Regions:
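Two-component histidine phosphotransfer core
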Residues: 1-135
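Hydrophobic core positions in the C-terminal catalytic ATP-binding module
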Residues: 75, 143, 149-157
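A short beta-strand-to-loop motif within the catalytic HATPase_c
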Residues: 128, 135-147
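Intrinsically disordered, glycine/charged-rich C-terminal tails and inter-domain linkers
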Residues: 159-161
Length: 161
């Protein structure tokens, strides 16, 4: 159970994310596939990262991106090591942030997305605690014809010892 821990081994976080994605895949009758790319430099049992910061972005990719497309959705989760941090890139081929906002109902618009706002609050707390700058960057992806090709989220996480 990682819910009470501030930091977990990368391997534990990957296991939790994989379980979450498998459950959502079953729930949505395999409407999406996912791929995990792990930098071989990451020691999955020795490198610790803040717990539960990646999952809300996977949830957004599924619910607000992929569920809006016809055909099979794709999610890629890539973890890369750079000195004392791990960069996590979550990329989907969904409808994109602009279209997702357009198709929201008035009820959905009134409801704030708590998952990502909680992550941002946690990042601010962790930044103050560790004296570092963790950040999240959103990139809208487009096909050559200008149509949306999905969303990329880049999360910089410290390796915590």
């Amino acid at each position: 159970n990682n819910s009470q821990k501030q930091a977990v081994p990368v391997g534990d976080e990957i296991a939790a994310l994989t379980l979450y994605l498998e459950l959502e895949s079953l729930r949505f009758q395999q409407r999406f596939e996912y791929h995990l790319i792990l930098d071989p430099e990451i020691e999955t049992t020795a490198c610790y990262i803040p717990a539960f910061l990646i999952q809300p972005f996977l949830e957004n990719a599924i619910w607000h991106g992929i569920m809006g497309i016809t055909g099979i959705g794709r999610i890629t989760i890539e973890l890369k090591k750079h000195k004392n941090q791990i960069t996590c890139i979550v990329e989907d081929n969904g409808i994109g942030r602009i279209k997702s906002e357009e198709v929201k109902t008035s009820v959905q618009k009134a409801k704030q997305s708590y998952g990502t706002s909680l992550v941002e609050s946690r990042l601010n707390l962790l930044n103050n605690l560790y004296g570092i700058e963790m950040k999240v960057q959103f990139v809208d992806l487009y096909h050559k014809d200008g149509n949306s090709a999905g969303t990329r989220v880049i999360i910089n996480l410290p390796i915590i010892s």
